[in-house]
């Protein structure tokens, strides 16, 4: 699930949700909702922006 992978990659890079939000241009509330499982299937463009900010392939967050 993206929620566990997103948090794992974010923490591995030592980023807070706010820092990732700034790097990815995705709202912090959206990131929090994804990580909490409230948005388990984010839009592909959102996943792409998060992956780019985390320097991973989008498939790694799928």
Mark where each language-model region is:
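A short, Lys/Arg-rich alpha-helix, primarily the initiator
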Residues: 1-12, 59
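Residues within the helices of the helix-turn-helix
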Residues: 7, 18, 48
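The alpha-helix within a helix-turn-helix
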Residues: 10, 21, 51
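Short alpha-helical DNA-recognition segment
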Residues: 14-33
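DNA major-groove recognition helix of helix-turn-helix/homeodomain DNA-binding modules
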Residues: 25, 43-60
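Short, conserved catalytic or interaction motifs in soluble domains
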Residues: 36
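Gly/Pro-rich interdomain helix-loop hinge
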Residues: 39-40
